[in-house]
């Protein structure tokens, strides 16, 4: 695998990590990603909510959690309360419903700030990947493995990848911030 291919793979991973982190940030709409990572105590051991129940959003401001085993509904309700997400689960016999309260302006600003911070972390990560790739290319040149013109071409390709993925991180975060600010 070439240096450029390795770099591209690492940058794609950084972007996927950003998408995953942003999925967990609260918006004004119900989103299963808000609670799927919550740890629930079932059968004597902690498990992620998405591993013990199906999570759906039947309405814009409501989540419906249907446990694979209906006896776990109470444990799921307790686990969501313990997670301190500011959500109040309503437990019935076979499911858990969560009404998503409307976000205040203060919460919107806080969520947008978190979104921006995640984007910046990703861009720093992408630039670190670029630095490591350039160092590897320079090392190969100093060892005589590649020529000067190949080094320059590699550096140019690596910079193009960096620009592309930083722009993609900006676009992803901008879309999420717009989603957060939509009332």
UniProtKB/Swiss-Prot annotation:
InterPro entries: Ribosome_recyc_fac (IPR002661), Ribosome_recyc_fac_dom (IPR023584), RRF_sf (IPR036191). Its main location: cytoplasm. The keyword Protein biosynthesis applies. Transmembrane segments: none annotated. GO terms for biological process: translational termination. GO terms for cellular component: cytoplasm. It comes from the Bacteria. Pfam families: RRF. Keywords: Cytoplasm, Protein biosynthesis. Coiled coil: none annotated. GO terms for molecular function: ribosomal large subunit binding. Responsible for the release of ribosomes from messenger RNA at the termination of protein biosynthesis. May increase the efficiency of translation by recycling ribosomes from one round of translation to another. NCBIfam families: frr. This is Ribosome-recycling factor. It comes from Protochlamydia amoebophila (strain UWE25). The gene is frr.
